[in-house]
């Protein structure tokens, strides 16, 4: 079985779920990552290493992103850089941004040539733009509550005209609905291009509890 939250995702594996409590993005309010992170970066990556050793595909997100043939990618809420590292290994120009310094330490140790930034997605200004931005690992639903629109607007500002924002997250009652996410994206001048229920492009319908959404920036939109 391939990815939902990630390649090899098993919703019954509490150890794995503990690895996916979120990505902290702002410092003015409590957030789920700060409250719930229970593993180190090395332990987080070890989960995927065990799955890869067992023959599972743990690069579903990278495969999905690469399908759009970008040359540059922002790994937004990168954590240990698992997705960004794989994309960089495939020859893409990658920048990773996260607020978890411990997770970024692992990213820097494993891929020192990649540009890893300790920053808030809601306010960061990278002074450049990207062909694709990926937010994997449930980033959207583990942001500080109330910051979702600011994060999407700010990362969208870093997209090249015609570029894509790719986000995969669990649809959880009381958190972020797919309708609300689409509205946030629309307000950031992004149009829905594709939606799937897994990173392996299984078909989507409203009964699904996980979505991988692709929103595209209009070709005539201004750069970052």
Model-derived regions: residue spans:
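Conserved beta-strand signature within the Rossmann-like core of class I S-adenosyl-L-methionine
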Residues: 162-170
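A short acidic, Gly/Pro-enriched loop at the edge of an enzyme's catalytic core
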Residues: 122-132
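Class I SAM-dependent methyltransferase SAM/SAH-binding core
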Residues: 80-123
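A short SAM/SAH-binding and catalytic strip from SAM-dependent methyltransferases
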Residues: 131-146
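Conserved class I S-adenosyl-L-methionine
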Residues: 9, 19-69, 71-79
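A short glycine-rich, Lys/Arg-flanked "PGG" loop and its adjoining helix->strand segment in the class I
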Residues: 149-161
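Core SAM-dependent methyltransferase catalytic element
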Residues: 205-224
């Amino acid at each position: 079985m391939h990815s939902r939250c990630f390649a090899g995702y098993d919703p019954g594996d509490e150890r794995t779920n503990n690895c996916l409590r979120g990505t902290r993005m702002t410092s003015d309010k409590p957030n789920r990552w700060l409250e719930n992170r229970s593993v180190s970066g090395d332990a987080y990556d070890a989960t995927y290493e065990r799955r890869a050793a067992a023959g599972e595909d743990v690069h579903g997100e990278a495969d999905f992103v690469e399908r759009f043939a970008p040359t540059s990618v922002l790994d937004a809420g990168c954590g240990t850089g698992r997705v960004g590292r794989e994309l960089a290994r495939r020859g893409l120009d990658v920048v990773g941004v996260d607020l978890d310094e411990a997770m970024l330490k692992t990213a820097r140790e494993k891929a020192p040539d990649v540009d890893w930034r300790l920053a808030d997605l809601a306010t960061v200004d990278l002074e450049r733009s990207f062909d694709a931005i990926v937010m994997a690992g449930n980033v959207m639903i583990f942001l500080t509550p109330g910051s979702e629109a600011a994060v999407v607007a700010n990362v969208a500002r870093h997209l090249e005209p015609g570029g894509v924002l790719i986000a995969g997250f669990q649809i959880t009652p009381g958190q972020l609905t797919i309708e609300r996410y689409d509205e946030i994206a629309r307000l950031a001048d992004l149009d829905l291009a594709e939606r799937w229920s897994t990173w392996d492009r299984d078909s989507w319908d409203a009964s699904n509890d996980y979505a991988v959404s692709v929103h595209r920036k209009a070709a005539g939109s201004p750069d970052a």
